[in-house]
Amino acid sequence: MDLTQIQNPSFLKEMSISELEGLSEDIRKFLIEELSQTGGHIAPNLGVVELTIALHKLFDSPKDKFLWDVGHQSYVHKILTGRAKEFGTLRQYQGLCGFPKRCESEHDVWETGHSSTSLSAAMGMALARDLKKTKEYVIPIIGDGALTGGMALEALNHIGHEKTDMIVILNDNEMSIAPNVGALHNVLGRLRTAGKYHWVKDELEYILKKIPAVGGKVAATAEKIKDSLKYLLVSGVFFEELGFTYLGPVDGHDYEKLFETLQYAKKTKGPVLVHVITKKGKGYKPAESDVIGTWHGTGPYKIESGDFVKPKEVAPAWSAVVSETVLKLARTDERIVAITPAMPVGSKLEKFQKEFPDRMIDVGIAEQHATTMAAGMATQGMKPFLAIYSTFLQRAYDQVVHDICRQNLNVFIGIDRSGLVGADGETHQGVFDISFLRHLPNMVLMMPKDENEGQHLVYTAMQYEDGPIALRYARGNGLGVHMDEELKAIPIGSWETLKEGTQAAILTFGTTIPMAMEAAERLEKAGVSVKVVNARFIKPMDEAYLHDLLGKNIPILTIEEACLIGGFGTGVVEFASENGYHSALVERMGIPDRFIEHGSVTKLLEEIGLTTDAVVDRIHTMIPSKQKRA
């Protein structure tokens, strides 16, 4: 079937099971071929082909609402709703988004990039439906570990209490990104082997009613014996106790079983949870055999061999630099523990996990818990290293404020994927952390200019005992610089002059330092002398350095790959104002006040005007012509 000709899912209504099976093969082939060129979340989508087709066949989207959680499972949904022809642009600038996007299609009713939000949103939609007295199904599809998130459990509790009509699809592939962890995962494991409790209960009631004379009376007591029955037949009754009708487990690749179960769910009042067992990566051997999450989300790859197409790496990944330095220090300090919220592979903690399994803690998709747990460990003299993506640290803001900073606890937060991350887009750009951490009392915030300085700042963080400290580091690789053998502590709040200059100064840090250095060199050739400063401590700032610089009364430009509002540049402006430098000219470059879409980092930087050319132009506008050398 030519998938690019699909306009909407209505064509599925008339298809037989054998035709649907052929469509499944076509979709898997399409995904494998297309994603080999663009990269993307291949394994999660190969696992939900039959489930997605079954949902679109039995329900009526967009009247009926599908909410995908996590949203990277929505590729098949996008194909069935008329977007196959755009897959060549997947996750590229102004191309097809890798997550549901409301502006893309009326079938995308909810946007998800972070996990565990679908049930709360679905509850809101269902309550709105009931208040408006309309009739549509609300169907959140939750999987890839999203059910372990605290927000999802809060929603389950409320939905079950209110008995709201809703069909929750639990897509259980036994993995999130890496293998699932936690007691809830164990509950699901028992349910997978428990058989179909509800089918048995209904059969028993039917048989009881057939008994002459007493059958009706006996059947009337069925509800009273329901608890005993479910404990007899099901080893895990978690969802029933929360107030849901539990259906399953059902084979998520068997159309007959899916149709039977979903039709039953449609006729059931109150909240229903359909437990669907799927195989992550189904139909592509390299993805099927993956047990650690390598094929969860990928770049381009070679279909036949399963080898990834990667540019030759001349420098280590930032995540590896940080995690391996932590590991090196952990070998001589038993107090060091590593904590991750379901991202051991992305944060490059596999080596730490292998060497110190009892000191490596993966809490699952539970950022709030991970953060406060780290705080608890710090109260007992441990040295927790919390490795967390910038975008996911947003979810633990209150815990950072209330539990870490307020108590001034020695927690080292490794803020991975800081700055623009590219293809994952606006839900994942790590551009807000400076603004929401800089204003917190007791917090120290750093970002290195290169991987050598990065390892020294990790050492600095582990030696620091006066409160919380955080290190920002980017997605991708370092610069390939020489790495010192011996680690050293860098004085807290100290900046570094990278290039001397007399007519203007650029204050920056991290990934924008190469941009600043190149701009300064070009300006030097044009007769403009510009100082470049490595402001590696975003907080506290080097106040002595700032006093000296502001006292020279030369234009200052701050550059940051982070949002301008409340950012580093704002801090410099505040310092100048509060210390009486009212004639100082301080201008800022950074991320504007909007969400940044998906695309390559280079393209996105061009789009927002954060380039070497833009820096050169800005400095020229800041320096009066009469001050420029010929």
Swiss-Prot record:
Annotated CDD domains: TPP_DXS, TPP_PYR_DXS_TK_like
Q: What is its EC number?
A: 2.2.1.7
Q: Which UniProt keywords apply?
A: Isoprene biosynthesis, Magnesium, Metal-binding, Thiamine biosynthesis, Thiamine pyrophosphate, Transferase
Enzyme class, broadest EC rank:
transferase
What are the GO MF terms of this UniProt record?
1-deoxy-D-xylulose-5-phosphate synthase activity; magnesium ion binding; thiamine pyrophosphate binding
SUPFAM superfamilies, alphabetized: Thiamin diphosphate-binding fold (THDP-binding), TK C-terminal domain-like
The residue range of the signal peptide is none
| Reactions this protein catalyses | D-glyceraldehyde 3-phosphate + pyruvate + H(+) = 1-deoxy-D-xylulose 5-phosphate + CO2
Q: Which residues bind Mg(2+)?
A: 144, 173
Q: Which GO terms describe its cellular component?
A: cytosol
Protein's job: Catalyzes the acyloin condensation reaction between C atoms 2 and 3 of pyruvate and glyceraldehyde 3-phosphate to yield 1-deoxy-D-xylulose-5-phosphate (DXP).
This protein is called 1-deoxy-D-xylulose-5-phosphate synthase
Lineage summary: Bacteria, Bacillati, Bacillota, Bacilli, Bacillales
